[in-house]
Amino acid sequence: MVKEISVGNIKIGGDRPLVLVAGPCVIENEAATLRCAERLMTICNGVSMPLIFKASYDKANRTSVNSFRGPGLKDGLKILKKVKESLGVPVLSDIHSIEQVEPAAEVLDVIQIPAFLCRQTDLVVAAAMSGRVINIKKGQFLAPWDMENVVGKAVSTGNDNVILTERGVSFGYNNLVSDMRSFPILRQTGYPVIFDATHSVQLPGGLGGSSGGQREFVEYLGRAAVATGIDGIFMEVHEDPEKALCDGPNSVKLDDLPALLKKLKAIDAIVK
């Protein structure tokens, strides 16, 4: 049985219904972030789906040094705190160094370990020692069964509030594929599993100076993943993906989200 974990007033795992983790790839500015969060709350209330709001304060692994990275730790956490307090929604963001754990834990309900950093023992342990829920994204270079050892690092601290996220595996150059077998294997760890449906259609570095993406496949992969009985779906969204400052090619347009969530919710109800 998969552990049930509390994130604010939301329950994920066990036999609970699907949870949405969504927001812009990066905090572009305060107004846009609040606007996106408010829209997501309205959409999720309309389809009765729990929401965890996500946004990055720093995109530390952008393809180019010239790419927009976000407002940084201090200003970014201020914006996420405002989202959390004004809307009453749990918030998630990713950390990149041990020094970020303490200030992040003061605001975030969920601390995320980026896929590229999931093997960094000291970072995983420090994040888990904060006592917050930890979402560990599976590296594009790892097999699903490799995550058993990563989970072991986190729970060695006594914090077993761990979530795992699948975001695809490298397939040749500038491409990712999603192996549906990964989900039941990851759930065998005993912890909730989320599918990152938008990063999984990313084409890393595919545009030369930035990553490309194939958002037209988000729905298909999302439907397939939900059919395996996963616990949550992760999607980066934007009011106008073509103008997004990060990961626009694989972000879902907010206008398209309600119809997609209804389909995913229907599949989730059948398999649980």
UniProtKB/Swiss-Prot annotation:
Keywords: Cytoplasm, Lipopolysaccharide biosynthesis, Transferase. The keyword Hydrolase does not apply. It is an enzyme of class 2 (transferase). GO terms for biological process: keto-3-deoxy-D-manno-octulosonic acid biosynthetic process. It catalyses: D-arabinose 5-phosphate + phosphoenolpyruvate + H2O = 3-deoxy-alpha-D-manno-2-octulosonate-8-phosphate + phosphate. It holds the Pfam family DAHP_synth_1. GO terms for molecular function: 3-deoxy-8-phosphooctulonate synthase activity. It comes from the Bacteria. Pathway: Carbohydrate biosynthesis; 3-deoxy-D-manno-octulosonate biosynthesis; 3-deoxy-D-manno-octulosonate from D-ribulose 5-phosphate: step 2/3; Bacterial outer membrane biogenesis; lipopolysaccharide biosynthesis. Belongs to the KdsA family. This is 2-dehydro-3-deoxyphosphooctonate aldolase. It is found in: Cytoplasm. SUPFAM superfamilies: Aldolase. Its EC number is 2.5.1.55. GO terms for cellular component: cytoplasm. The keyword Cytoplasm applies.
